[in-house]
Amino acid sequence: MSQAEMSTCSMPHTQRVFQEAVRNGNTKELHSLLQNMTNCEFNVNSFGPEGQTALHQSVIDGNLELVKLLVKFGADIRLANRDGWSALHIAAYGGHQDIVLYLITKAKYSSSSR
């Protein structure tokens, strides 16, 4: 691991920066952060103070681009939030048809590859 990667990994505010990028819908910043965190002990599926993962928040916001990015970097589409809702439930309830279709496709693909 390079010195730059080690310093990124040891930043105490990494989780806050990650969640802030998600809340702001900043795909470019989030992509950069996730790329730099690939060699770290960083959990893309961690829950924020509202009981949501970054994926849940991106679905709530209707941000398909961010949803795709998070899934690419390992976000678990089957995780439930503190209310028991998966990303698919949230997308359907919010009327985000593009995200619903994407999540169904990903779920179908991931279950057939097991």
Curated annotation (Swiss-Prot):
Q: Is Transport a UniProt keyword of this protein?
A: no
Q: Which Gene3D superfamilies match?
A: Ankyrin repeat-containing domain (1.25.40.20)
Family matches, as SUPFAM superfamilies: Ankyrin repeat (SSF48403)
* Functional description taken from the UniProt entry: Promotes loss of intracellular domain (ICD) of Notch1 in embryos. By down-regulating ICD levels, could function as a negative feedback regulator of Notch signaling that attenuates ICD-mediated transcription. Involved in angiogenesis. May be involved in somitogenesis.
Stored PROSITE patterns: ANK_REP_REGION, ANK_REPEAT
Start-end of each ANK repeat = 50-79, 83-112
This protein is called: Notch-regulated ankyrin repeat-containing protein
Tell me the organism: Xenopus laevis (African clawed frog)
GO annotation terms (biological process): Notch signaling pathway
Q: Which SMART domains match?
A: ANK
Q: Which residues cross the membrane?
A: none
Q: Which GO molecular function terms does the record list?
A: enzyme inhibitor activity; phosphatase regulator activity
Query: Transmembrane helix among the record's keywords?
Result: no
- Which family does the entry's similarity section mention? Belongs to the NRARP family.
Output a single Gene Ontology CC term carried by this record. cytoplasm
Describe how expression is induced or repressed: By Notch signaling via a CBF1/Su(H)/Lag-1 (CSL)-dependent pathway.
Which proteins does it associate with, and in what oligomeric form?
A: Forms a ternary complex with the intracellular domain (ICD) of notch1 and rbpj/suh.
Keywords for this entry? ANK repeat, Developmental protein, Notch signaling pathway, Repeat, Transcription, Transcription regulation
